[in-house]
């Protein structure tokens, strides 16, 4: 081989190919802003929740847990929504899921869960026999499994999904007091449970989802692009559940396989997120979100699985050559 210029170009092309993510490979990035409705300075010193006269820049990424770039958006799946808020004090990541609970509480069960979501390669789809064997062996996974196999697992629009932070955060105020917090992003115009007037929960029927998978596999991404082009910018209200840290020793509130009781800890409307422009793919793929990437006034609740998840996000970014 003597055409060295051709060889050089070939290696350059191969070097430009991005290394794929382990999970959430198919995604789309956006930019926008976040503004709070009221100050939460009695709970946290984080400026993003204290300064009412400011709008904070935001970068966000919508994605799907299973599959790759060619996977249909309406395939039964768990969707992801990661938001990075920029302030003068630091950066704050809010990593959310389309389901309010997860399958496991212990990090040592992760590899077995991963095997149940491996048909040919890691996290390419649900291996149904392995998956249901996993659920039988780990009954705490049933809650998440039932939600996944309901209409909540079939979505054709990122704009219409309710997003939940499965990982618990800690708010720290100026007095040194601590509060446990879980977030949820609700599409603007819905109530705290994601319901519109008439109590019709937004979801897709399986037959419609199957049709859309063949008709337009990029339905969710196209929906975002169309909305931005028409000026119907996606908007989500942030709701927070706040718990005194004294409850942290109670087993029920340590598990991510159950939701917090809303009668005891009612969600409070906190602010509005509006996404106003699409981000080029080469820029959004250089982002690495992590549940522990937080600034002053907020920290990650340091249980075993949260620490593992934070490490996994950062290690995945390092493997792709990007950092938080």
Give a label for each model feature:
Residues 1-324:
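Active-site-adjacent core segments of small-molecule enzymes
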């Amino acid at each position: 081989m003597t055409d060295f210029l051709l060889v050089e170009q070939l290696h350059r092309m191969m070097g430009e190919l991005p290394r794929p993510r382990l999970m959430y490979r198919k995604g789309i990035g956006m930019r926008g802003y976040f503004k709070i409705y009221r100050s939460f300075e009695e709970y946290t010193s984080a400026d993003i929740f204290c300064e009412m006269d400011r709008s904070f820049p935001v970068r966000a990424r919508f994605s799907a847990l299973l599959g790759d770039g060619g996977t249909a958006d309406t395939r039964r799946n768990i969707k992801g929504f990661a938001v990075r808020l920029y302030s003068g004090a630091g950066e704050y990541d809010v990593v959310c899921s389309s389901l309010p609970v997860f399958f496991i509480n212990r990090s040592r069960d992760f590899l077995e869960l991963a095997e149940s979501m491996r048909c040919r390669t890691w996290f390419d789809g649900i291996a149904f026999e392995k998956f249901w064997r996993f659920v039988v062996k780990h009954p705490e996974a049933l809650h998440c499994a039932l939600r996944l196999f309901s209409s909540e697992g079939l979505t054709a629009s990122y704009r219409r999904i309710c997003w939940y932070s499965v990982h618990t955060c800690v708010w720290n105020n100026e007095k040194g007091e601590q509060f446990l917090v879980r977030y949820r992003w609700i599409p603007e115009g819905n109530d705290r449970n994601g319901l519109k007037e008439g109590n019709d929960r937004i979801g897709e029927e399986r037959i419609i989802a199957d049709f859309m998978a063949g008709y337009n596999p990029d339905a969710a991404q196209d929906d975002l692009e169309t909305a931005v082009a028409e000026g119907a910018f996606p908007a989500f209200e942030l709701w927070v559940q706040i718990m005194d840290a004294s409850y942290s020793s109670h087993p029920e509130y340590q598990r991510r396989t159950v939701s917090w009781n809303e009668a005891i800890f009612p969600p409070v409307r906190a602010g509005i997120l509006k996404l106003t422009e699409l981000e080029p793919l080469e820029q959004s793929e250089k982002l690495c979100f992590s549940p522990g990437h937080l600034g002053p006034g907020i920290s990650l609740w340091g249980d075993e699985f949260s620490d593992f998840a934070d490490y996994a996000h950062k290690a995945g970014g390092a493997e792709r050559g990007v950092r938080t």
